[in-house]
Amino acid sequence: ELVHALAGGDEYLLHPEALKKLEAYAHDTAVLDRLGEIKRANKLDFAAYVKKTQGVVLNTDAIFDVQVKRLHEYKRQLLNAMHILYLYQQLQNDPNRAMQPRVFLFGAKAAPGYAVAKRIIRLINSMAAEINADPICRDKLQVVFLENYRVSLAEHLMPASEVSQQISTAGKEASGTGNMKFMMN
């Protein structure tokens, strides 16, 4: 609703260049504060949804760092997992390490016969169990694999996310539109 009002109506839906009108509000503290309030409300909504559906309590003060897409080696969910393990090791080496709190959210489905993809899902779930139970990581690092990723879950997730990992191997992603959905939210 706010973007609709600031952009002057629905024109931006068919003509994205109409979003340039938003540049006029780049330093408008009232608009920026309102956008922050909307993002916060979306994060709280998503956190309530995850608690209800998966029993997981999210740190809504953390950055929501998201990678949701079909699981495949070229989409590099494993690379993202290795980055999380690096951060985890940094915290193990220095529990007082200052870092921006981050919740890593994964959502994916694997083809039935794709054994490597299924192992990556197991790895992410194992990492989540270890990291989320570690008191050193509390309020700093959290990992959640979103079960049964689908459109209704995406409707809660996309408006709440702050970072969308788009790290597929160059030239391999045919025509994904998930990045555009995240951008518009």
Give a label for each model feature.
Residues E1-N185:
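Catalytic cores of carbohydrate-active enzymes across secretory and cytosolic contexts
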